[in-house]
Regions:
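Phosphate-binding beta-alpha-beta segment of Rossmann-like dinucleotide-binding domains, i.e.
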Residues: 86-88, 93-144, 156-159
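Conserved small/polar residues in nucleotide/adenosyl-binding loops
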Residues: 266-273
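An N-terminal-biased, well-structured beta-alpha scaffold segment characteristic
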Residues: 1-91, 196, 216
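Conserved acidic E/D residue at the C-terminus of a beta-strand in Rossmann-like folds
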Residues: 172
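Hydrophobic/small residue at the entry helix of a nucleotide-binding pocket
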Residues: 153
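Rossmann-like adenosine-cofactor binding region
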Residues: 53-59, 175-265
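Glycine-rich Rossmann-fold phosphate-binding loop(s) that bind the pyrophosphate
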Residues: 150
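Phosphate-coordination loops involved in phosphoryl transfer and adenosine-cofactor binding
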Residues: 1, 65, 141-144, 226
């Protein structure tokens, strides 16, 4: 019987579909450390992968592996060279989570602009009189937002930003100005030049040699003091040390980070083991 390895649980409807098919068996892996995944996929014919890492040795270890299906858009967490050598197919779910990510970006933007964590902590701590001492909040109405990357997520995000009456600018060398204009945005040609006039920046670009650390201290210094930067794309696009420095120096208003260059979840022992 063919075996599917589900690395990281998926939506219950997906699990129901798997259960309804008796042509194969499946196993769900919740311990996402690379060594554990490597052990589990030895006899797998197919792997369903979310955000965890599948390096070369984990792929070479799976002698029966024929396909890896990425539960998302990017595939930089998969060693493609190993897949090519073994003729292993790699699939993505291109349209599955565009709206969810766009909503998540907006959630982070609103949470940061309204200092949600600070005010929430103040109320839960019973410090009701402290609110006037907390740092100021800002509106996103009539503010400039730059969407860097205008794929499915960028297109889902622009609709929601326009709903809040934001002024949307788009940076994407592969999308023409007419397409962007039709959706209510304005195309910019130079990311570095445009970013200094923005009140918010949302990153939706792939991680490549060209985009690695594209957001660095030099660029962060040019941004407005009230600028909020959101990264729901890939860790490594923002230089994390530079961002930490910029935040500590109050160069920007805040940052919403959904991804990191190195995720300890896949390399550290699980909480129950420590």
């Amino acid at each position: 019987m063919k075996k599917i390895l589900i690395v990281q649980p998926i939506h219950e409807k997906g699990m129901e579909l798997l259960k309804s098919n008796s042509d194969y068996s499946y196993e769900v892996v919740e311990d996402l450390r690379v060594e554990n995944v490597k052990q589990k996929n030895v006899d797998a014919d197919a792997v369903s992968l979310r955000t965890s890492i599948l390096p070369a040795d984990a792929i070479e270890n799976a002698k029966n592996l024929k396909i890896i299906s990425r539960h998302g858009v990017g595939y930089d967490n998969i060693d493609l060279n190993s897949c090519k050598k073994r003729n292993i197919d790699v699939a993505i779910t291109a349209t599955a989570n565009a709206v969810a990510v766009a909503e998540h970006v907006l959630f982070m933007l609103l949470s940061i602009s309204k200092r949600k964590s600070m005010y929430d902590h103040s109320v839960k701590s019973g410090k009701f009189t402290e609110r006037n001492k907390l740092p100021k909040t800002i509106e996103i109405w009539d503010k400039n937002i730059l969407i860097a990357g205008f794929g499915r997520i960028g297109k889902a995000l622009i609709k929601r930003c326009l709903g809040f009456e934001m002024n949307v600018f788009v940076y994407d060398p592969f999308v023409d100005s007419k397409t962007i204009s039709k959706m209510g945005g304005k195309k910019v040609e130079d990311l570095s030049a445009a970013i200094k006039d923005m009140d918010a920046v949302s990153l939706h670009i792939p991680l490549t040699d060209q985009t690695k650390n594209i957001i660095n201290y030099k660029l962060l210094k040019t941004m407005k003091k009230n600028c909020i930067i959101i990264n729901a794309a890939r860790g490594g696009i923002i230089n994390e040390k530079d961002l930490d420095r910029a935040l500590n120096e109050n160069l920007i208003f805040g940052a919403g980070i959904d991804v990191f260059e190195v995720c300890l979840l896949y390399t550290s022992p699980s909480p129950r083991d420590s």
